[in-house]
């Protein structure tokens, strides 16, 4: 198709890793040919940027600031595994959604959210973008203009009114509908069908059903071209994965909250912070169990915490457990892809020779 759509003589940049053709010369993907040894100036011929290996495990990227999407979109990632919506709220919207509704300005939410999301989808297209819907805690919502009128004072906001529990609550549902309108605008008006969504902090299976039903009522029907992911960050998501499966297309493990809740350990508390460790056997068993149960029903599993890029042994554990994708910060995309490629090669070699190292821990659930 490209050979007929691109006119002869046109300058293009081909990203062979991701299967993308860019119009013109994309400076971030190419570098100038070195100056001739005779002392001549650098030529205009371009050569490929740093080569990166192809991996069976998809390497996604985490992103918060939409204005950085074009810059980081040139990285050899397979898409956005976690787009944080909160950055748009604090940087461009500034005001509590219920306050904006009360003052007659709900369109401000839809316009700002859709514009930020559009930038990311456009920069990454046709690669998928997974938007995590709002996950502010009540204390963070109170910091938005007008928020003190609508938000409770919670002694433990981390475990309070956040994530999915807000979406269907009569006190907040109209605000959540604005988020869904923004998603629909990006997909339908702007035409970026590479946008999918992720539901954070969903404690119960019936909550997940309520959220999926609510999205359908707002014109966002889960299907082949619109995926709904669940942020697996609560032990109930792991224990009841066989039931959550019927309402989701996949999971993205939020290793920070999941570790904290499994270990009963506040990583922000200096006294017990040393006990916080994603590599603890309890966490590993939970992750491996989730992958097995999800795969049984054809669901995919990703992880979007920092652990895979910080601890090479943890990344190896994930690949050996069969994880489908890993999402890391932009500065870790290339190094993580290289490391994962080495792990996959090692696994293949061990399989061929039958002389691989046995697991040193028992991951049986």
Regions found by a protein language model. Give the residues of each.
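Conformationally flexible catalytic loops at phosphate/diphosphate-handling active centers
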Residues: 1-7
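Short, Lys/Arg- and Gly-enriched loop/turn segments at beta-strand edges
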Residues: 6, 18-26
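Acidic/polar low-complexity surface segments
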Residues: 27-32
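Conserved alpha/beta-domain cores
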Residues: 33-365
